[in-house]
Amino acid sequence: MIYLLDVNALVALGFANHEFHDRVAAWVLAHPSSTLATCAITELGFLRVLAQAPAYGLTVAQARALLLRMKEAAASRFIFLADHHDVSHLPTWVKAPKQITDGHLAGLARGNGGALATLDSRIPDTYLIPES
């Protein structure tokens, strides 16, 4: 199975002090045959969050290096999903502005035979990363 990690799941996986790091890391370890995925939106979101949020305090260069190390450490498990979806691919459940990116990512994952892996139970048609 391919799991496109949303920004929050990607940040939690990469930052050991994140409140959900153990949850995401345990899930990843429990599914060694699963393929993890990123895309331009999730990678850029990862950089933005880690460079902008005071809790992380990383520069853009440091955040980029962390993401590259994460992907290299699990090279056989990470793939990059190219994004060729336009707005016609948005799921019908997208009704509000806050749902647009989540809907797009869910559609991108589904279009590549996978699921959007998230910590947010409010996003329909996704895979909710379980608590350990």
Indicate residue ranges for each PLM-predicted region.
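Short, well-ordered beta-strand segments in beta-rich or mixed alpha/beta enzyme
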Residues: 49-50
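Active-site neighborhoods of divalent-metal-dependent phosphate/nucleic-acid chemistry enzymes
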Residues: 73-121
